[in-house]
A protein has these predicted regions:
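Predominantly a Rossmann-like dinucleotide-binding segment in NAD(P)-dependent oxidoreductases
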Residues: 1-72
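Short, hydrophobic secondary-structure boundary micro-motifs
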Residues: 6, 59, 121, 170-172, ...
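A generic structural signal for residues located within well-ordered alpha-helices
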Residues: 39-42, 151, 171-174, 178
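Contiguous beta-strand/loop segments that form the cofactor/metal-binding neighborhood of enzyme cores
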Residues: 45-125, 156-166
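Short acidic, glycine-rich loop/turn motifs
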Residues: 82-86, 136-141
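Short polybasic amphipathic segments
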Residues: 109, 125-140
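Active-site loop of classical SDR/Rossmann-like NAD(P)-dependent oxidoreductases
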Residues: 146-157
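C-terminal helix-rich "cap/oligomerization" subdomain common to oxidoreductases
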Residues: 158-193
Length: 193
C-alpha cells in the first residue's frame, strides 16, 4: 500500500469526564469492566486489523485512578503495549479531555509503515477544524491531507447485518473474540490479577 508494510499502530482513546453527575455504575469496576475493556477494546481491534495480526503478546499494561480518589473503582488512565505477529501497537486511554475541546475526545490513530505513515484525527483537528474525519498521509512520494467527512462508513451497517443474518461482513467473529480476549487479559494484567 501507500505506506508499505505496517509496523505499528498508535491509538488514543481520550474521553471527557464532564462536570455532571454520572450513575454509580460508571465508577464501579465490576459494572463497567475497566478502562481497557471499556475503551481500549476498540484500539486493540484496530491494532489487530491494521497490523494484520491474528495473535499478540501483551508487553505492558497499566491502569490508574488519579482524579477520583473517592471512587476507588474508577480508572482515568490506561496504557497498553502489544506485539503481534504482524506488528506492534501502543494504546493510550484516558478521561482527561479538557472542557474547552469541542468534542468528547481527540481520538487519533497513527499507522506507521516502512514507507510512510497515516494519521487519522477522528473527531476534531484542534484549532484547525471542529469537525472530524481528517486523514494525513506521508510517504516517499507525497504528503497529503484528505477530508474524509463524506466517505461512506459501511462498518456499522454491515455489523447490524451480521447480527441479523449471522454473517461476517463487518469483521469475523474470530477477530471480535480475539480483540476482547486480549482486552480482558490486558485489563487483568494491568490490575495484577
Amino acid at each position: 500500500g501507500k505506506i508499505g508494510k505496517v509496523k505499528q499502530t498508535i491509538g488514543t482513546g481520550p474521553h471527557r469526564q464532564g462536570n455532571y453527575e454520572r450513575p454509580d455504575w460508571f465508577y464501579d469496576r465490576q459494572s463497567y469492566g475497566g478502562i481497557i475493556t471499556d475503551i481500549g477494546s476498540h484500539q486493540i481491534h484496530q491494532f489487530l486489523v491494521f497490523t494484520n495480526s491474528n495473535e499478540a503478546k501483551i508487553n505492558h499494561a497499566l491502569v490508574e485512578n488519579t482524579t477520583k480518589q473517592d471512587k476507588p473503582g474508577f480508572q482515568d488512565f490506561g496504557e497498553v503495549n502489544l506485539t503481534g505477529n504482524g506488528g506492534h501497537g501502543y494504546i493510550r486511554l484516558d478521561w482527561f479531555t479538557p472542557d474547552a475541546l469541542n468534542t468528547w475526545g481527540d481520538g487519533r490513530l497513527l499507522i506507521l509503515g516502512d514507507k510512510g505513515y497515516i494519521e487519522i484525527r477522528k473527531y476534531t483537528d484542534l484549532v484547525k477544524s471542529e469537525k472530524g474525519n481528517h486523514l494525513y498521509l506521508a510517504n516517499n512520494d507525497e504528503v497529503k491531507y484528505m477530508d474524509c467527512s463524506n466517505v461512506k462508513l459501511p462498518y456499522f451497517r454491515n455489523l447490524i447485518n451480521d447480527v441479523i443474518n449471522r454473517t461476517e461482513t463487518a469483521c469475523s467473529q474470530e477477530l471480535t473474540y480475539l480483540s476482547m480476549k486480549l482486552a480482558i487479559k490486558t485489563q487483568e494484567l494491568a490490575e495484577n490479577k
